[in-house]
């Protein structure tokens, strides 16, 4: 009898633990967010403000459409976002404080155990000609969209799927995936000390 009761108790405790796991994960995530530096919260807020503006354009880009149709929809989205952000400038999202934080995080990563591999990956990326990128402008369609090693971004704040980090030379670009716009950029994100040889 006692044995059966013990088994039932163990079964109940196991089920209770399973039910509590999602709550524990949620509490852990909330606890981690509480410990985020204010500068990260400021960045996330500014990035979300950009996405809110993007959503207000009400342009639905359908991936299943023809290439010409998708390009037309992207162009329409870019135009509406530009109209909604007529005064947009470098530093609206990457403020000086946020920019310094990002530079520090990138430097930490490049000086870490994966630094050599990251530098090699960037060194082998397709070279870009001297290029002047501007906020609220389209990333030039005739130039390759540089891929960024995931390990380089490990210490950077999380981004929603609509935005991506891109490294162009030594500049960090905040790239709007759906419209192809440059939401903001951070010059000299990679310091001279971490400059990629051959760049």
What is each of the regions a protein language model found here?
Residues 29-31:
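Boundary at the C-terminal end of the N-terminal hydrophobic targeting segment
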Residues 147-161:
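N-terminal post-signal-peptidase region of extra-cytosolic proteins
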Residues 76-147:
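Mid-length scaffold segments of soluble, non-membrane domains
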Residues 40-98:
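Early exported N-terminus immediately downstream of N-terminal targeting peptides
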Residues 181-199:
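C-terminal partner/receptor-binding element of secreted or periplasmic proteins
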Residues 163-177, 181-182, 190:
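A short, solvent-exposed beta-edge/loop patch
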Residues 15-26:
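Bacterial N-terminal signal peptides
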Residues 1-12:
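N-terminal secretory signal peptides that target proteins for export/translocation
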């Amino acid at each position: 009898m006692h044995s059966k009761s013990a088994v039932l108790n163990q079964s109940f405790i196991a089920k209770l633990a399973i039910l509590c796991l999602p709550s524990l994960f949620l509490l852990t995530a909330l606890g981690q967010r509480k410990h985020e530096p204010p500068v990260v919260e400021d960045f996330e807020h500014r990035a979300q403000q950009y996405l809110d503006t993007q959503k207000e354009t009400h342009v639905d880009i359908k991936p299943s459409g023809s290439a010409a149709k998708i390009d037309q929809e992207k162009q329409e989205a870019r135009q509406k976002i530009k109209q909604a952000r007529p005064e947009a400038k470098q530093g609206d999202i990457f403020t000086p404080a946020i920019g310094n934080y990002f530079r520090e995080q990138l430097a930490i990563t490049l000086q870490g155990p994966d630094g050599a591999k990251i530098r090699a990956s960037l060194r082998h990326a397709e070279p870009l000609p001297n290029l002047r990128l501007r906020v609220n402008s389209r990333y030039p369609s005739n130039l390759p969209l540089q891929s960024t090693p995931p390990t380089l971004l490990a210490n950077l704040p999380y981004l929603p799927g609509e935005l991506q980090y891109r490294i162009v030379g030594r500049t960090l670009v905040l790239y709007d995936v759906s419209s192809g716009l440059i939401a903001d950029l951070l010059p000299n994100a990679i310091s001279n000390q971490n400059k990629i040889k051959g760049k």
